[in-house]
Amino acid sequence: MYPLTKPESTIHRLTRKSVRSSLLLGVRASPRLRLDWEKRRGVWERGGSEEDIMASLWIASLLLFSLFNLTVGRPIYLLPSKQDNKVKQPLQTSRPYNIAHRGSNGEIPEETAAAYMRAIEEGADFIETDILASKDGSLICFHDVILDDTTDIAKHKEFADRKRTYEVQGSNMTGYFVVDFTLDELKSLRVKQRYPFRDQQYNGKFSIITFEEFIAIALDANRIVGIYPEIKNPVFINQHVKWPHGKKFEDKFVGLLLKYGYKGAYMSEDWLKQPVFIQSFASTSLIYISNMTDSPKIFLIDDFTMPTQDTNQSYWEITSDSFLEYIRSYVVGIGPWKDTIVPPENNHLTTPSDLVDRAHAHNLQVHPYTYRNENSFLHFDFHQDPYSEYEYWLNKIGVDGLFTDFTGSLHKYQEWAAASGTDEKSAYGLLHKIALMISSYD
């Protein structure tokens, strides 16, 4: 802590004003959030460190989002910044990509503005989202085709008669479907954490955002941040949502990307200004949009035993060398479920498959999903240490990017690994060298 006599810095003065304003505006925020503010307030009143001050500023933004969501039908988002990308810090391309899976959703409810803002703050290279469509054709950021698991839809008695049963990817599913609600109706809902063992204090604070609002968050960042949107369940969406002039879900999706300047082949000048990867489990959608945009595309791969959602093939079949050779004409990489690369048995890793090596042989990148820090998601081999998992996948398996729920921990690992030098990037190697040093004194 600074001594009490230290002159107040500009950041302290700005934070003092911001905190007071946010506290006054945020009186309707959750008691736990207000309590956190009361603790933080003591930091700047005592002249705390800038790290603590910045943490306070971040919570200020959450309070403001909380207020907007509670008082207006639609939250307020800034328009994309007019700042020239030439003066922004460029996207790092020298190491595997840190892909914020649904934002920093290990901390904040998934696919919300706050989760994406937090991921950018934590060092994400790309913010990832799932794109679905509302009844009236607006594109939104939401993972499930039903609203039941991650919103407060059950509390909205006015929508009690909207529950339906539809066939989704060959199976019947019952719930409140996104496609049965207009954008205004979806905006009236509030998002909650998917997993009960994660922080619940932000439940009910944030609304569903649109694809355009998501893009605005990336473009308004103070450095170049890529976006990684998924064309989600295109077969289902095209069955239930209709656009004028015979347009399809994919047409609307690409149209918005082009509207906001996302274009260019991978690593081209245009792409580096506004990086984007377009992803989908439906290879037919990726092939369809290849005539509309040259932006790089990633073909997602599920469990080998699962059928594809559009062609009813097995993923085992479409990871064959012949299919990889075929799909490389349309995509720059694949995004496999990590267990398809290294199958587990009794929560222990088994022998890795050759999928990564074969993909690289076809000049395809590999971005596996999903990396989560909680013990229940870590194989025993990693001893409840997410750094060990990152080390294994980045250095032993050699993937080109990771989808993670915990952007901050992956960023810190990569910064640590880079600082340790090329000869000492391996965590296991470092531990071995330390052990040798200690043993030399025995």
Stretches with model-predicted labels:
Residues 9, 21-22:
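Low-acidity, Ser/Thr- and Arg-rich intrinsically disordered low-complexity segments
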